[in-house]
Design a protein with these regions (language model features):
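Metalloprotease/metallohydrolase-associated module, dominated by Zn2+-dependent proteases
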Residues: 7-16, 146-204, 222-266
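Short alpha-helix carrying the canonical HExxH Zn2+-binding catalytic motif
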Residues: 202-221
Length: 266
């Protein structure tokens, strides 16, 4: 795909995105025009909200089948579209007694929904939509949904909640957190013990991390290739927080192969 324009749709409740800086980052690295637009979900009508609600996941072990949403789910989605800050008040994974308490969406179904809404369907334009909704995809290998930070292709989705929740924390963190919970204790002391080892909500490191996901999306749409196997590359699809921070913060560059591809784009 030969790109001429990239449209970024902001998520204003996450100031760490730094959308203007991202636009400059893209223009510094690629010969494309960049347009910034408001939150994609802000002005959906009732019919569109209902369609979006159909992408919700209520059972992580059941592959998504679009359903007729209940009124309370549609009402929630309508309020969320008007004010995405509501998402921050929903149950987080670490606080959930049951995973069904967490608000989740099928990433591919949401992508289909977004594609149907976008009026600008020119082939040389890439749309990247930020959201604090948690996107997930179904993994056939273990027959369940898993959180995802990014859904590539076009339109692409970057889930800020997915960036926090999808890459796993260390095994030590989970063992200690489970031990605390078994004693009826919170996990704040465990989080403090491991502070800096993983991203947290509204983490100042998000801006740098998001640059890497932007690169992954653009490279996928240019080359058709998914991610990079090397940890020393910003295109690496990190499954652990430590690997994410290593690739995006410590290394913060592309491998030789992908740097050569980037150089040809300028």
């Amino acid at each position: 795909m030969k790109l001429k324009k990239i449209t970024l749709y902001d998520e204003p409740t996450i100031p760490e995105i730094k959308i203007s800086d991202l636009a400059s980052f893209i223009k510094d690295n690629f010969s494309v025009d960049v347009v910034i637009k408001d939150n994609f979900f802000l002005n959906l009508n009732k019919s569109e909200v209902k369609s979006l609600t159909k992408t919700r996941i209520f059972d992580i072990y059941k592959k998504k089948n679009l359903y007729e949403p209940e009124k309370h789910a549609t009402d929630f989605e309508e309020q969320l579209c008007k004010n995405s800050l509501i998402m921050e008040k929903t149950t987080k994974i670490e606080d959930a007694e049951n995973i069904s308490e967490v608000v989740m969406y099928d990433g591919f179904e949401m992508q289909k929904f977004l594609r149907n809404q976008i009026r600008d369907t020119v082939n040389d334009t890439l749309h990247i939509i930020f959201t604090n909704r948690l996107t997930c995809t179904f993994d056939e290998s273990d027959s369940r949904y898993h959180g995802r930070a990014v859904i590539c292709s076009n339109p692409a989705i970057i889930s800020t909640t997915g960036i926090i929740e999808a890459p796993a924390k260390s095994k030590e963190f989970y063992i200690q957190a489970m031990a605390n919970k078994s004693q009826g204790l919170g996990i704040n002391s465990v989080k403090e013990l491991h502070k800096g080892e993983f991203l947290e909500y509204h983490d100042e490191r998000l801006a740098k991390i998001i640059e890497g996901y932007i690169l992954q999306i653009i490279f996928y749409n240019i080359t058709g290739e998914t991610f990079c196997e090397y940890l020393d590359c910003r295109l690496n699809n990190a499954h652990w927080q430590r690997d994410l921070l290593y690739s995006q913060i410590e290394v913060s560059k592309l491998c030789k192969k992908h740097q050569m591809i980037l150089d040809m784009q300028k």
